[in-house]
Amino acid sequence: MRVSNPFFASRYRETAVLLKATTALLLLLLGRSEVAAEQMWVDFRVAGPFVCRADFSLKGHESVFMELAEIQQDLIKKFGVPPSGERIEIYLFQGRTSYSRFVKRWFPEVPTRRALYIKNNGPGMVLVYLSDQLHTDLRHECTHALLHASLPMVPLWLDEGLAEYYEVPPQDRSHQNPHHNGTVWSFRFGRLRSMEQLENKQELKEMGRSEYRNAWAWVHFMVHGPPAARMELVQFLADIREGTPPGDLSDRLARRFSDPEDALVQHFKTFWK
């Protein structure tokens, strides 16, 4: 999925839709300046590369903006992903009605979802409306935005696996992700998705609940498991960044581990003890 092509991703990730050229051209010509200048915005925040505008007061939400900036620093520290060279715009809406109205006005071809990450030839945009999942949605979509602001491409499964990893608060990422229990039970029933199976998923509509859970599991293994696994992920992302054909990450792990799937299962058996 190349970010030079217009696309969007959403928290309800059943589909991926290419924005028509007319919509992309509208955004480029009428511009983000017109979007940003609308009178509806009543609060404004800056955190790292993120510039946020909201049609409601952001008082009480300060912590999540600190977390968004922290995600960028963590991507640098853990994976060597360079800091974004572009700003990433966030637009927050108090209700679903104003959110849907905005999306239909500026992106009429895009189905309305609870949260959207939109990327065309310019900087990425994150659109979210206020709900009890606001902070989770922001962390998830902004992870996509950071990755695609720094890398020319990210494999779909890895893109989603990293977003699932970072969507929870920092203190919960290693041991308290909601995917953990479901992952353990799926392994007990032999429902492990190999990395090769995930790599074959090319469209968001192919990613169901099981695929997201398994994508997160592989990311957790590479972040918190054997150092050799993280080294392969770091080098994989470095090759993408440098324009070197990266091959499949599964092939890299197979050269490091005689049985990567068993290594994954063993990681989940021992890490939480």
Where are these regions (language model features)?
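Juxtacatalytic substrate-recognition/specificity segment
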Residues: 38-155, 245-255
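N-terminal secretory signal peptides that target proteins for export/translocation
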Residues: 1-17
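Bacterial N-terminal signal peptides
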Residues: 20-30
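Bacterial Sec-dependent signal peptides at the C-terminal "C-region" and cleavage site
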Residues: 29-40
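Acidic/His/Gly-enriched intrinsically disordered linker/tail segments
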Residues: 104-129, 150-273
